[in-house]
Amino acid sequence: MTSGFALDVRNWTETLGWQPSPQQQQQFEALYHGIIAGNQRLNLTRITDPAEFTEKHLWDSLYGLRPLLTDDWSGEIIDIGTGGGFPGLPAAIALTKSRVMLLDSTRKKIQFLQTLAQELGLSNVTVAVGRAEEWGRDRRQRARYDWATIRAVGPATVCAEYCLPLLKIGGKAVLYRGQWTEEEAIALDRAVTILGGEVVDVSATFLPESGAERHCITLQKTAQTPAAYPRMVGLPSQKPLG
């Protein structure tokens, strides 16, 4: 494929503590081409430059999952509001023994991602059309997952209400943010206490090429989430906790 797509493997080794295999590098490139092709009919991403895509979709997705990259990890992840498949698809490529559920409320996007995952040979990916509020109240999904990821979905307090009900006790959620303020941190602490969790890590970094600021907020579920949460569809965003 001749698209200018290239991974700075040395940089990834230094910043992520992990190096993709040649097969994984091919899958990342195929993911790029698949997303660009799908972007012609679906609003998947505004990022189409290969170098920017590599930094802001691939590297950024994996930065929040650094603890899993060197651990030969084999748990179950749910990517909530996956949109164009980030961070779920990069996670599925990197974590070959994991199982990744891509959840989104837009059927056309989910149908596209299902086809793309098959084209990439990702047998560890499943997809579903749904809302996090509904899934968090479904007995088959509630308290099921080891990790949850959520990026570009809404305020951190809302993301916490989407994620924590779906996690097992001891499970973790990664909230991908840009800037992070003290006001947001205080509100999130209040919300996760209500939901049966705690904030266990706030990792600040800068993207390796553009220098854009990023924060990954890691939550851990420490107790069963009260049955009242998540609230009905729309309420978490209309009346955020915290």
Swiss-Prot record:
This is Ribosomal RNA small subunit methyltransferase G. It comes from Synechococcus elongatus (strain ATCC 33912 / PCC 7942 / FACHB-805) (Anacystis nidulans R2). Belongs to the methyltransferase superfamily. RNA methyltransferase RsmG family. Its EC number is 2.1.1.-. The keyword 4Fe-4S does not apply. The gene is rsmG. S-adenosyl-L-methionine binds at G81, F86, D104, S105, T106, A132, E133, R151. GO terms for molecular function: rRNA (guanine-N7-)-methyltransferase activity. Gene3D superfamilies: Vaccinia Virus protein VP39.
